[in-house]
Curated annotation (Swiss-Prot):
Any one GO MF annotation of this record: ABC-type molybdate transporter activity
Name this protein carries in UniProt: Molybdenum import ATP-binding protein ModC
Cellular component, GO, one term: plasma membrane
Name of the gene encoding the protein in the UniProt record: modC
Localisation: Cell inner membrane
Length: 352
């Protein structure tokens, strides 16, 4: 568990945090440049020193301004991966990985190397590596120090699109197989969608929202970040069954289900899906003989006018689903809170 209750002033910027983060999964730190994202993880890592408050990791006090406690970075058991990999140019990859390696991680070396797909790189110098390869090595080096927490400061920011696509699957694999909590700084919605369990939104050094990805994503805090045509819902589902005759998989959403193209995941596997509001249409009665496979019973929570369109907030199986319709459709269907209807979903994307 990471307890953050501190304030810090750097130049004209003031960062104030009072949150407790669970000791598992990935928490994305999100916001514009200058919002305080890097300042936050620098304070946690010990690169800067807050003027007020405390930082406590798994019961160990890293910072306590009143008591004058400020552990040095090397005593914090916190790994840090920067935007640029910062590898030692005169060491081969193997040497970079072993630099600072904890004795407790010696037996884990081969497993971690395989997990990150860097075994073929062990005898190469950093200068011969691609940007994505360098970042995989940097992540491996940080993990081999046996940290209790891993900080990643926009690790994909300096990479081109092909290299980002190369690195994302390795980060996703890490989240599944390495039981180390991570703070992931990013201003990329795509990265957050694919990686984060939770999101903390910072603005001018203040926390605007903090919670599960699907909750924060559907909140008004994210509206400025989402172009109107990209308003969407993030939902947690589980694999329910695979169709016996067609290449389709059913995903459980409450007591209802969604059909998607066949997945390789086993039954009961947990997934996260994204549904664009523009891919959801509404009808008052169950449609007959329709080509749309996904028709869900839903209740209207509210509706909002938005530049000539209407955003309809629905509840499906205790989850929030958004639909975008025209004012004409709203009036003709008499959309109002509490109305039960059917949501027709044209497309579903798997995000994680």
């Amino acid at each position: 568990m990471l307890e953050l209750n501190f304030s810090q002033t750097l130049g004209n910027h003031c960062l104030t945090i009072n949150e407790t983060l669970p000791a598992n999964g990935i928490t994305a730190i999100f916001g514009v440049s200058g919002a305080g994202k890097t300042s936050l993880i620098n304070a946690i890592s010990g690169l800067t020193r807050p003027q007020k408050g405390r930082i406590v990791l798994n019961g160990r006090v890293l910072n306590d301004a009143e008591k004058g406690i400020c552990l040095t970075p090397e005593k914090r058991r916190v790994g840090y991966v920067f935007q640029d990999a910062r590898l030692f140019p005169h060491y081969k990859v193997r040497g970079n990985l072993r630099y600072g390696m904890s004795k407790s991680m010696v037996d884990q070396f081969d497993k971690l190397v395989a997990l990150l797909g860097i075994e073929p790189l062990l005898d190469r110098l950093p200068g011969s590596l691609s940007g994505g390869e360098k970042q995989r090595v940097a992540i491996g080096r940080a993990l081999l120090t046996a940290p209790e927490l891993l900080l990643l400061d926009e690790p994909l920011a300096s990479l081109d699109i092909p290299r980002k696509r190369e690195l994302l699957p390795y980060l996703q694999r890490l989240t599944r197989e390495i039981n180390i909590p991570m703070l992931y700084v990013s201003h990329s919605l795509d990265e957050i969608l694919h990686l984060a369990d939770r999101v903390m939104v910072l603005e001018n050094g203040q926390v605007k929202a903090f919670g599960a990805l699907e909750e924060v994503w559907g909140s008004s805090v994210m509206n400025p970040w989402l172009p109107k045509e990209q308003q969407s819902s993030i939902l947690k589902v589980t694999v329910l069954e695979h169709h016996p005759h067609y290449a389709m998989t059913a995903l459980a959403l409450g007591d209802q289900h969604l059909w998607v193209n066949k997945l390789g995941e086993p039954l009961q596997a947990a997934l996260r899906i994204r549904i664009q509001a523009s891919d959801v249409s509404l009808v008052l009665q169950p449609p007959q003989q329709t080509s749309i496979r996904n028709v869900l019973r839903a209740k209207v929570v509210n509706s909002y006018d938005d530049n000539g369109q209407v955003e309809v907030e629905l509840e499906v199986g205790g989850k929030t689903l958004w639909a975008r319709i025209s004012p004409w459709a709203r009036d003709e269907l008499a959309i109002k809170p509490g109305l039960w209807l059917y949501a027709q979903i044209k497309s579903v994307s798997i995000t994680a």
